[in-house]
A protein has these predicted regions:
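Compact, glycine-rich, soluble single-domain proteins
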Residues: 2-166
Length: 166
């Protein structure tokens, strides 16, 4: 009647340790339906997940082997990579989407809080450099192009400046 070590590690807040994925484990939205990250007004093609709830922010990219896109974490000015499986680029974003700092974090490391940051964007290692993201860049979300005409009742419901405060 002894417990196996794996049953002790299960938690409703943490993803399965054996799961192999390149999307946030808490999201059910397919990458094709997500907005795209823009840098200085230019669309990058990167799918953009947004972690808005406490649960989503706490889990972040835990349980992933990489990410096919980027994760925008709202109401956040620091992150850690404890229990992460891969190195990531971390972009600290301030008001109106302005980049405050960019760094790369290896697994089991803790980032420094950035007092001017209101959000953090996590992406695959090397993506920030490849996309030209640097201090002073402006990040935003470009809405996906609908395959059919949008419902007028829901038009304009998407905020394209995620996590910003005006």
């Amino acid at each position: 009647m002894g417990r196996t070590p794996l049953t002790l590690l299960k938690s409703p807040l943490l993803p399965s340790l054996s799961m192999s994925t390149t999307t946030p484990t808490w999201s059910t939205v397919p990458a094709g339906a997500l907005p795209r990250l823009t840098v200085d007004g230019q669309e990058t093609g990167l799918a953009l997940w947004t972690a808005r709830t406490r649960r989503e922010r706490n889990i972040g990219l835990l349980g992933t082997d990489s990410i096919d896109g980027a994760l925008w974490i709202t109401r956040c000015n620091w992150v850690h990579c404890f229990r992460m499986r891969h190195t990531i680029d971390v972009v600290y974003v301030g008001r109106r989407g302005k980049v405050v700092a960019v760094t790369t974090m290896a697994p089991n490391r803790m980032g420094m809080p950035r007092l001017l940051a209101t959000a953090v964007v996590e992406m695959r290692q090397g993506d920030a450099s490849r996309l030209g993201i640097r201090r002073g860049s402006i990040l935003a979300a470009a809405p996906t192009v609908p395959l059919s005409r949008p419902d007028p009742a829901s038009a304009g419901a998407q905020n394209t400046m995620l996590g910003s405060t005006h």
